[in-house]
Amino acid sequence: MVGEMTNNGRIRPSFPVKDLTSNEGSEYGGPVEFTREDVETLLHERIKYKSKYNYKERCENTMDYVKRLRLCIRWFQELELDYAFEQEKLKNAMEMNEKHCADLEVNLKVKEEELNMVIDELRKNFASVQVQLAKEQTEKLAANESLGKEREARIAVESLQAAITEELAKTQGELQTANQRIQAVNDMYKLLQEYNSSLQLYNSKLQGDLDEAHENIKRGEKERTGIVESIGNLKGQFKALQDQLAASKVSQDDVMKQKDELVNEIVSLKVEIQQVKDDRDRHITEIETLQAEATKQNDFKDTINELESKCSVQNKEIEELQDQLVASERKLQVADLSTFEKMNEFEEQKESIMELKGRLEEAELKLIEGEKLRKKLHNTIQELKGNIRVFCRVRPLLSGENSSEEAKTISYPTSLEALGRGIDLLQNGQSHCFTFDKVFVPSASQEDVFVEISQLVQSALDGYKVCIFAYGQTGSGKTYTMMGRPGNPDEKGLIPRCLEQIFQTRQSLRSQGWKYELQVSMLEIYNETIRDLLSTNKEAVRADNGVSPQKYAIKHDASGNTHVVELTVVDVRSSKQVSFLLDHAARNRSVGKTAMNEQSSRSHFVFTLKISGFNESTEQQVQGVLNLIDLAGSERLSKSGSTGDRLKETQAINKSLSSLGDVIFALAKKEDHVPFRNSKLTYLLQPCLGGDSKTLMFVNITPEPSSTGESLCSLRFAARVNACEIGTAHRHVNARPLDYRLSLG
């Protein structure tokens, strides 16, 4: 019990005290309980002596009084520790409840966003059904079913929101209860501090009387300490002997079981031998009787012969059983000897286990050091390769295109220095030779392409800024390279493959103490306007006039980081969640049909992944950024035949790509002024092209002979990019708290 009320209304503490048998409490028979009256009585107690000159009695009474005081003080100290522990426990419970509430709020927000997406999709389906209803009356039933699904989804959303709200209210009630308990504990803690102060004050008055008794107490303490240490050592030895005895008993039990089995087998064999001997004696008696009567009864000769044969067979069986008995006795002797051998083997195995544990610890340390060295060497290799690298990819011929013409237009050198890196383009009888970091032929698979960039993606986990973008004319395979073909796992693009590698690597690095948080944003630049592709507000993504009503401003800070104001940022925990977001963004992206491409991307697509990692053992924090960009395709107005909105889109695309060319040209010439602000695209890519990022460009070209001019322009632009020196990328390591605004650089 915590306490009880006295007549004057004050609380009289009454707490059970643990057995203090290691010290003075052993004289009072175990558990002791104090009340406030007991404490006051003890403090005001006056020691009475039978004789004023009996110093032995005075010393014993004083020591007894001091022991009771020390027991009371010890009780208050343990009580204070219990309250401190309870207070810390309640504080931890409150923090866990607050964290649980925060997690519930985040989950509620994510669920609301997902369900809003579902509702928007259902509304879109319902709108299309309504249009069909006006045209064809026969589809009325399908429209009603779609409306029913939307209502069910809305009811499910409302029920889910109600359940989450109820759980949140319950958690808040638990938090309020915990706060009340903490307040009560604080009040009791103050009361105990007052008691402790009064006891310490009175104890200081008695300190003078205790000086004579201190010497005896110190000697007793030293003796007790020595005894306790001896007991501890003996307990350790006893524990080790118990473990050895238990192991020996296990081995002995196994041997005894084998011995009992062999003894039982020997007894059984002896019984069988005795039975056979009895049968033999009985048959011998019968034979003797028959032989005595043989002269009279010749008819029994056959029976006698049969019995003799049986007797010989039984004699053989007796010999075999005797041999088995001897073998069993030998096995028993071997089992007795194997008991000692097993005990010795157990000790050897125990030593081997300890040695293996030591080797395992050394191997783990070497693994950690090796991982550090791998990261260092990997980043050194990337630096030596250059900050802006260029890969060229030639798409395969489509159906209807002449493969023989492709062989005349594009060729690949076979010399050792240019193998896998060179490409030759033939135009009007003149050959143009280019060399890049890597050239992918049309037969190269998506996996082949990803293997070449996988180490660059690893740099983002190590704390670097990484940018990969695809450039080329419309229809050259940029979107296929970056996104792949939905529904076909073998043709997944670089973006989903990069995310799968990052999630797998994050899982493998957990054993080394690393924890990562990942955040995703997706946007498009359409007609020099930024659109948020993850926004749940449909009007914020696209307006009828092609201009987004939401203004998204690009901001650069002093540290070289870039973020887009008000852009939707989503915390991701799995590659499936990212696939869902990519599908959502693909539905919102601007795509149109032109004379050169059935599904032409009419905007620049920017996928950004911010990576924040923390190592619990080294307390090191890294922050990396991975930008994956699918640029809109360049096209000539004379070939695309664009008019109206398509004409405006083409002009905006060509203008932004021209601004990108101006930036690359200025960087290649190392001019003082680089025109990053000439377009939204170049301003957004400023961190990737400004020297603090590891940047890779894919130049995609088509083998179609009619596109040789555009392919030559793309290859020349790529060669200029490959010649740029933009500086050395830096690893971003710090101990600052996570910034939840997604940075593009």
Curated annotation (Swiss-Prot):
Where would one find coiled-coil regions in this protein?
A: 76-223, 259-389
What are its GO cellular component terms?
A: cytoplasm; kinesin complex; microtubule
User: Where is it localised?
Assistant: Cytoplasm, Cytoskeleton
Q: Show the Gene3D superfamilies listed in the entry.
A: Kinesin motor domain
- The UniProt annotation places ATP binding at 472-479
**Where are the stretches annotated Microtubule-binding?**
65-77, 198-745
Which keywords belong to this entry?
Answer: ATP-binding, Coiled coil, Cytoplasm, Cytoskeleton, Microtubule, Motor protein, Nucleotide-binding
Residue segments, region Disordered? 1-31
| Pfam families, per database record | Kinesin (PF00225)
Which SMART domains is this protein grouped with?
KISc
The family database entries (CDD domains) matched by this protein are listed as:
KISc_C_terminal
The GO terms this record gives for MF are: ATP binding; microtubule binding; microtubule motor activity
Q: How does this chain assemble?
A: Bind to microtubules in an ATP-insensitive manner (in vitro). Homodimer and heterodimer with KIN14N/KATC (in vitro).
Annotated PANTHER family: KINESIN-LIKE PROTEIN (PTHR47972:SF46), KINESIN-LIKE PROTEIN KLP-3 (PTHR47972)
Q: What is known of its domains?
A: Composed of three structural domains; a small globular N-terminal, a central alpha-helical coiled coil and a large globular C-terminal which is responsible for the motor activity (it hydrolyzes ATP and binds microtubules).
Which family is annotated? Answer: Belongs to the TRAFAC class myosin-kinesin ATPase superfamily. Kinesin family. KIN-14 subfamily.
Which named protein is this?
A: Kinesin-like protein KIN-14M
Organism equals: Arabidopsis thaliana (Mouse-ear cress)
